[in-house]
Amino acid sequence: MQLTLWTYEGPPHIGAMRIATAMQGVHYVLHAPQGDTYADLLFTMIERRDRRPPVTYTTFQARDLGSDTATLFKNAVRDAYDRFKPEAMIVGASCTAELIQDDPGGLAAALGLPIPVIPLELPAYQRKENWGAAETLYHLVRAATNGVATPDRTGRPVAVNILGPAALGFRHRDDLIEVTDLLGKLGVSINVIAPLGARFADLARIPAADANIVLYPEIAGTAAAYLARKFGQKTITTVPIGLNATRDFAAEIAALTGSTVPDDLESQARSSWYARSIDSTYLTGKRVFIFGDASHAIALARIAATEIGFTIAGLGTYSREFAREVKSAAALYNVEALISDDYLTVEAAIAAAQPELVLGTQMERHIAKRLGIPCAVISAPTHVQDFPARHSPFAGFEGANVLFDTLTHPLMMGLEEHLLGMFREDFEFNDQAAPSHLGAEAAAPVATAPILTGWEPSAEAELKKIPFFVRGKARKNTELFAAEHGVTLITIETIYDAKAHFSR
């Protein structure tokens, strides 16, 4: 166990919560101490969902450990069923409750509830959030399809399942809209989308489809592998993030249906023309460091290298389960993959690589800010600003447009700030210079010599910290204040005294 102020993934029961929250009619009873109810805030405050997650906590306290906590759990299960009337229930223990070994699955089964009760064994001290989400989806799918025969799919239109979109997912809602629209243009019907919006009964219909689209391998990979083994379904693993990846995805779907890709499929794409223009040469060769979950890190590396012309200075992930895939991707760009969930190791790697742009998670945003490097967030975990109310996908052709803006704007704005800094002291463009298109007014005769005020170097340096568009006013007000109070040498204290004076 490691004591840290930041973790890229929560414990596996958070992953289970993400699956239960994404679905409808499924309730999660979690054997957990009182403090573990913090997880609700991830959905209501960070993702800004309009309802609490469907989770009942036993919320045992320290004084309960000397009594029968098993009875406490059974009462919580019974009360949750009576109150919420779920269609299916999953039960498990949080990382803390795992230590008291109450066997939530066995206790819930002993109650004999008239609904499916799926026990989860999530080793909190060996695994993490995405693994917990994948394991939960797998167990739900396995329970729902138990006893379902392999259907005869001959003579029917091609249909697919979309697996992976979940609650608290990075742009999952918007990605799903884009992929659904793309499949419609390719003439493919959607059988089931899971877990987002699905009911437990819907999972039993999954085998009826011809193939499973694994939109997010970290979440859906385990379930898709099981479905391929048991029902012989094809698995589409191309993640349509980026222009080229979306083209590959469309070609894979067209091959499944035996059709051709429509000529107007890319009518939404608006980024490729710029990559071919002379203006884009400013971006060519810029060094970029990429870190995130495996799917997004691999996809963004391909976009950065092949669609914009960046040089990959570093590539890594915190998803240890996908270390092999990330290492293979890193080899394509002649860099060594960074596989770590320690943010200090990531910070050291970024500092050593000296990139001009960082693409990462919320933590890489903080790291890049400390190092003075432009940054864009491209992967979970993220904060509230990366769960926008607007439509902002990463998948599909519209997602390629969003990604192009996401990757290029930090460098474009960085150039603007660099130019402002470069010419700040120029004789013609400095803050005190009058606009060049205006004539200079003749100086009015001065009847009495004003008090001459000077500036300490430290005060001049402090003044430059003020944004340039109000710096002139700040200088004028400070000098006026100094003249009125007989101050001949302006210090840092004078600046703040003047600010307080004119703020009244």
UniProtKB/Swiss-Prot annotation:
Domain of life of the native organism: Bacteria
Pathway where this protein functions: Porphyrin-containing compound metabolism; bacteriochlorophyll biosynthesis (light-independent)
Any GO BP annotation: photosynthesis, dark reaction
Xref: Pfam families: Oxidored_nitro, PCP_red
Alphabetical UniProt keywords: 4Fe-4S, ATP-binding, Bacteriochlorophyll biosynthesis, Chlorophyll biosynthesis, Iron, Iron-sulfur, Metal-binding, Nucleotide-binding, Oxidoreductase, Photosynthesis
Entry's Gene Ontology molecular function annotations: 4 iron, 4 sulfur cluster binding; ATP binding; metal ion binding; oxidoreductase activity, acting on iron-sulfur proteins as donors; oxidoreductase activity, acting on the CH-CH group of donors, iron-sulfur protein as acceptor
Catalytic reaction list: chlorophyllide a + oxidized 2[4Fe-4S]-[ferredoxin] + 2 ADP + 2 phosphate = protochlorophyllide a + reduced 2[4Fe-4S]-[ferredoxin] + 2 ATP + 2 H2O
Listed EC numbers: 1.3.7.7
Residues binding [4Fe-4S] cluster: D36
Assembly information from the UniProt record: Protochlorophyllide reductase is composed of three subunits; BchL, BchN and BchB. Forms a heterotetramer of two BchB and two BchN subunits.
Function: Component of the dark-operative protochlorophyllide reductase (DPOR) that uses Mg-ATP and reduced ferredoxin to reduce ring D of protochlorophyllide (Pchlide) to form chlorophyllide a (Chlide). This reaction is light-independent. The NB-protein (BchN-BchB) is the catalytic component of the complex.
Protein name: Light-independent protochlorophyllide reductase subunit B
Species annotation: Acidiphilium rubrum
